[in-house]
Amino acid sequence: MFDIQEELKKLPDKSGVYIMKDANGVVIYVGKAVVLKNRVRQYFQQSANHPPKVQAMVSKVSEFEYIVVDSEVEALMLECTLIKKYKPKYNILLKDDKHYPYIKVTLNEEYPRILKTRRVEKDGARYFGPYSSGFAVNDTIDTLKKLFSLKTCNKNLPRDIGKTRPCLNYHMKQCLAPCQGGVNRDEYREMMKKICRFLGGQYDEIINDLRIQMETAAEQLDFEKAAQLRNKITSIKQLSESQKVLFTDLEDRDIIGYSADSTDLCIQVFFVRNGRVIGREHFIFEGEANEDKGYSLSTFIKQFYTKVQYVPSEIVLQSEVDDSETIAKWLTEKRGFKVALRVPQRGDLVKLVHMVSENAEITLKLHRERQSREGTVHSEGMAQLVKLLGLEEAPARIESYDISNTGSSEIVASMVVFENGRPARQEYRKFKMKSIEQQNDYGSMQETLFRRLNRAKREKEEGTENAKFSKLPDLILVDGGSNHVNAARQVVEELGYNFKIAGMAKDDRHRTKSLVYMGNEYELATNMPLLRFITEIQDETHRVAVEYNRKLREKRYVRSELDEIEGIGQTRKKALIKHFKSVAAIRKADIAQLQEVNGISEKIAKNIYEYFN
């Protein structure tokens, strides 16, 4: 048995990372320490005045582990890795795990292209971003392609020059046709360098060039060309207006501010590139309002910059953060150049930080209003559920199940969880049928519930660390009527459980209409909050099942399609799908884009391109 007080005496006087676990062996907190002995002992001192969240965490700790490292920076990096791996309950977690989009100009190619990417590499290309929205990137790229008549096809230049006829875009004067020699390599590259200067914020140069061309065309009485150039100037001005200059030094910065109400914390990030705000992002941390802001910001920065691929030279903060020197060293190592963390005291930066903080406050207010509306629906819906079904109390954990299949193939099930009336996405589970070989909703539902509940039994008996099925439902909802409910009840009772089970029945138009419970069917009126609540659960369960089914079908299609290509094995297939997301995108990619994928050489890229083209 783990004796916490005895183990505290054994802690070393060194830097490292500590891992707190509960009675089930689940990791509930990960932290780092300059001196492990001092930091970990602080948690268990009765005189310590810990915030409520820390007190709750300590009350759950049954054992701890630690890992010794050589430096604070190593400890910080390991802490970030373990938080990402375990997603501990009591750590501040970023729910958004996306990679931000960038605009990439492939100056490393003879005929550069402009494209969207989510990977920044040292490959000789120029990258601009990050942008907070893929739509913003697509709009900018589309505008630039129209303004500069760039090629949009996947022809490999200079290899394909003169091999095919010019496309429709050329005849519509929307492409310079480098594939036909309509513009030579040096001219095309110079134009792409202009685009890079444009993306870097140097709009005036391009506008002046276009204005000179417009005036020349007008003097030569070529009014059609002059009008086209005038329209281009207008488009560039409109695009530049969306990225106002804030700083004349044209530095890259991230501005981080925050706002908190009585319960929640909102952190907002403004991305400043070349002196212009190109985007922003916000993060809501529920229940974190009372945390020390230095700790909260420090934790956020470590997680946020673990995920992003580009780190600016300066990070401007609303207030001081814990471990600022260590974080700056880590970010400097990550970027390869010096990164500074700065809390401004005067000047324009103070005004901008205040603006970011105000935006965080507005975002938090809107979040609270939306929560209030949703909470009303959920709380009223839950109250009606309790009354309608005659339950003793509101179910704290609802598990909802649905089946999805394409004929007799790719039969899958989803398990969606709502805790205290709200979706708990980290608790969602997906199942691929093992014993069902043809369409059979009842059999599929029974297999799903058997595997889910049997796994829970096994985890409890074996004391599984980081158990994923140990939490049990207060109410099970199945997509269907009385037959589905009976099929589910049979499995539940066979395994020795006595959960409440209800069916979510739909009408002929596939809309939620009633609940089936204990042999009775309860119609749900259209104005009932309960109908909106059950519909939300049913739609979410259906969405997860359908998306999983689609993903498996895509994998099967990939196997049959990509297996025909020489040099493509399992590892390369996975890498291609991870990068492009679909076979359709792979089919459209050119050789250079294919080579961006890990493990895809020029030879393999040519094999793929030639197979599809």
Curated annotation (Swiss-Prot):
What protein name is recorded for this chain?
UvrABC system protein C
Q: Which NCBIfam families match?
A: PRK00558.1-5, uvrC
Keywords, alphabetical: Cytoplasm, DNA damage, DNA excision, DNA repair, Excision nuclease, SOS response
Subunit composition and interactions? Interacts with UvrB in an incision complex.
Q: Where is the UVR domain?
A: 204-239
One GO BP annotation is: nucleotide-excision repair
Instruction: Read off the InterPro entries from this record.
Output: GIY-YIG_endonuc, GIY-YIG_endonuc_sf, GIY-YIG_UvrC_Cho, Hlx-hairpin-Hlx_DNA-bd_motif, RuvA_2-like, UVR_dom, UVR_dom_sf, UvrABC_protein_C
SS bond list: none
For this chain, one GO molecular function annotation is: excinuclease ABC activity
Indicate the family of this protein: Belongs to the UvrC family.
Per UniProt, subcellular location reads as: Cytoplasm
- HAMAP family tied to this protein: UvrC
Gene this chain is encoded by: uvrC
Gene Ontology cellular component list: cytoplasm; excinuclease repair complex
Which Pfam families does this entry report, sorted A to Z?
Answer: GIY-YIG, HHH_5, UVR, UvrC_RNaseH, UvrC_RNaseH_dom
Q: What does this protein do?
A: The UvrABC repair system catalyzes the recognition and processing of DNA lesions. UvrC both incises the 5' and 3' sides of the lesion. The N-terminal half is responsible for the 3' incision and the C-terminal half is responsible for the 5' incision.
Domain GIY-YIG per the UniProt entry, residue ranges: 13-92
